[in-house]
Amino acid sequence: MKRSEIDRYVQDLLDFARARQFPLPPWTTWTPAQWARTGGEADEIRHCGLGWDVTDFGSGDFARVGLTLLTLRNGRPGRASGKDYCEKVMMVREGQVTPCHFHFAKMEDIINRGGGRLVIQLYNSTADDRLDEAGEVRVQVDGIARRLPAGGELVLAPGESVALPPRLYHAFWGQPSAGPVLVGEVSRVNDDARDNRFLQQLPRFPAIEEDEPRRFVLCTEYGRL
C-alpha cells in the first residue's frame, strides 16, 4: 500500500468518528515528530500495540478487501498482570471485506456504533481448523440467542452487537448502499502475532510504498522512529 493511501484512510476514520460523535484520544493525531519526542510515559501505547492499523491483507485492492482499525486500549499478550481486555474502533466500508478468520483465544463483541449496516458471515471451525460447512452456528446478539446455518449472514443495525467466541470463523463487510459503518470491538487481550487464524493464508500487515512523508504513525512503527 502507498503511504499516501494509508494516511488518507486514517484521516477518513478520524473524520467519520467525529461525525458519529465518537471522540478519540489526543495521541491518535500525533505526528511522527511528536512521537519521536515522547518518552517512556507512552510505553503502554507502544508495548500493547495501541494505535493505527490499515491493511489490505495483501489484496492490492483496499476498497474490496481491507480494513482501517484503531486500537484504543489493550493488555500486553502473555502478561499475567495489567489489562485483560481490548477495545478497538474500525471503519468498514460498503462491500469492503475483512477475510474469514477466527481467534484461538480471544472472545470479542462486535458492535455497530453507527452509520450503515454490518454484515457478518459465520461458520464453526473443525478440530483441524477448517470450515465446518454443516454445523449450525449459535451466537448471542445483545444477550439474545440466535441460530444460523453454516455460512449464515447476520446483519447488525446501528446499536446492535454480537458476541463471537474463540474459534468461530467470521468475515464481515459493510452492507452495500447503506453507507460505511463505525464498528466497535470489545474483547479479551488482542494478539495479532499469535491469535489469528485466517482461512486463507494472508499477510496481516501490508508492505508500504513510501510515496510521501507520513502524517500518522502505525501501531507497528513505533520502534522505527
Question: Where are these predicted regions, by residue range?
Answer:
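Double-stranded beta-helix
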Residues: 127-146, 173-225
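His/acidic/aromatic-lined binding-pocket segments of jelly-roll/cupin-type domains
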Residues: 88-90, 108-112, 119, 153-154, ...
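Short helix/loop capping segments that flank catalytic or ligand/cofactor-binding pockets
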Residues: 100, 121, 172-173, 194
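Glycine- and acidic-residue-biased ligand/ion/polar-headgroup-sensing regions
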Residues: 93-94, 106-108, 112-128, 133-135
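A short beta-loop-beta micro-motif enriched in histidine and acidic residues
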Residues: 77-86, 97-109, 113-114
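Conserved metal-binding segment of the jelly-roll/cupin
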Residues: 93, 150-177, 183-188
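A short, N-terminal "cap"/entry segment at the start of jelly-roll beta-barrel domains
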Residues: 1-86, 215-221
